[in-house]
């Protein structure tokens, strides 16, 4: 298919900086953020579509840049669901929780070094924030110790092999 894989050592260069470099090298390419992209949000909204018919009291979902949670909320809302949605993010990278409390996007100074590597984002995406700020009940902050405990618990009780971000 002609794809090129570009492995980025994030200890030497940030993801966003490398993407900016690649965008200059390939001006005709489409950059799809892993979270702050309308197509990504809409894809994740299909999860909310499916959950809407289940009549849950609440849903808790991991938060990094906000693509998953904003998509789920979008799907739930367009189906008329009143299910409350909560986010869970690493305490070491709690920009989403701080943003929700402050009423504006808070940016981490550096990429958080948490075991939940799928949530190592500097901040929520702008598109995601517009959805999250009015639709998410709360964002829970989880220590790396509790995340590791959850990974072990999933395996011990249900033989589920979860990566740390999924265990949030």
List the model feature ranges, each with a label.
Residues 1-168:
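PLP-dependent amino-acid enzyme catalytic core
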């Amino acid at each position: 298919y002609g794809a090129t894989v570009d492995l980025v050592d994030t200890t030497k260069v940030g993801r966003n900086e490398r993407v900016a470099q690649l965008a200059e090298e390939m001006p005709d390419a489409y950059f799809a953020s892993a979270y702050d992209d309308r197509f990504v949000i809409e894809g994740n909204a299909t999860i909310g579509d499916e959950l809407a018919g289940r009549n849950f009291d609440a849903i808790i979902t991991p938060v990094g840049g906000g693509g998953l949670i904003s998509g789920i909320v979008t799907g739930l809302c367009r189906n008329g669901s009143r299910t409350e949605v909560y986010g869970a993010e690493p305490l070491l990278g709690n920009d989403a929780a701080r943003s929700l409390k402050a009423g504006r996007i808070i940016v981490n100074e550096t990429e958080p070094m948490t075991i939940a590597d799928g949530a190592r984002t500097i901040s929520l995406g702008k598109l995601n924030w517009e959805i999250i700020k009015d639709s998410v009940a709360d964002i829970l902050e989880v220590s790396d110790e509790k995340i590791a405990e959850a990974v072990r618990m999933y395996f011990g009780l249900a033989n589920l092999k979860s990566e740390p971000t999924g265990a949030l």
